[in-house]
């Protein structure tokens, strides 16, 4: 069973604590029985892929924070289980039904160029503790960072898609197809979506 705990993080040098507070409130409101945890550089747990973490210090923003977020995401979920969500995603409905019936799930992304029309995305990623997919991700990540260029392919959607495909996890990781990400609450609801983007003027989207 996927533990009922949500995680997110702002791993920039100057975290936006107001946004983290809004994020925590949004997820807690729709999931009153869940724990909600936020991390910053000061509070994040130790990272197994330490060398890859150190390499992110040479990147510019927002790539640096995005790379660190992915490193943290896979390791926290592997050790603890739960649901790790990007800090720019807010819920439009409860996830209770979904986590009750699966061992792992991930969001999807519609496109990233004509050559890759549909990919898995770690933006919303949930799993039981010690799920093999996550340990495969942790093991494969150093090679991915060495071989590929850009956060997308090193640790993001391109990477997660390869891990699930190459290790046969398409049998036990549920693509969260209806979790369509839209710029605003109403478009997301119209498509049956579960989440919306947080924008500068809409940090309170918590319907």
Residue positions per predicted region:
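Glycosyltransferase-associated regions of secretory-pathway enzymes
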Residues: 1-69, 85-207
């Amino acid at each position: 069973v996927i533990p009922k705990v949500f995680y997110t993080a702002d791993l920039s040098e100057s975290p936006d604590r107001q946004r983290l507070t809004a994020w925590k409130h949004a997820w807690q409101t729709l999931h009153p029985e869940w724990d909600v945890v936020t991390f910053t550089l000061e509070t994040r747990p130790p990272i197994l892929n330490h060398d890859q973490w150190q390499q992110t210090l040479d990147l510019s923003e927002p790539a640096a924070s995005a790379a660190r977020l992915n490193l943290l995401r896979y390791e926290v979920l592997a050790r603890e289980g739960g649901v790790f969500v990007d800090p720019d995603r807010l819920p439009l409905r409860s996830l209770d039904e979904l986590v009750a019936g699966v061992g792992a799930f991930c969001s999807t992304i519609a496109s990233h160029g004509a050559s890759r029309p549909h990919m898995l995305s770690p933006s919303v990623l949930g799993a039981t503790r010690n799920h093999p997919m996550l340990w495969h991700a942790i093991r494969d990540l150093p090679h991915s960072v060495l071989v590929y260029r850009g956060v997308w392919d090193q640790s993001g959607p391109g990477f997660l898609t390869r891990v699930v495909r190459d290790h046969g996890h398409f049998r036990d990781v549920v693509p969260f197809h209806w979790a369509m990400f839209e710029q605003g609450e109403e478009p997301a609801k119209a498509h049956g979506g579960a989440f919306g983007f947080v924008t500068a003027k809409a940090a309170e989207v918590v319907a």
